[in-house]
């Protein structure tokens, strides 16, 4: 959901 999670994974 969060953009930061997408950047990390």
From Swiss-Prot:
Keywords: Amidation, Neuropeptide, Secreted. Transmembrane segments: none annotated. The modification Phenylalanine amide is found at residue 9. It is found in: Secreted. This is FMRFamide-like neuropeptide FLP5. The keyword Secreted applies. One of its GO terms (cellular component) is extracellular region. GO terms for biological process: neuropeptide signaling pathway. Belongs to the FARP (FMRFamide related peptide) family.
């Amino acid at each position: 959901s969060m953009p930061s999670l997408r950047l990390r994974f």
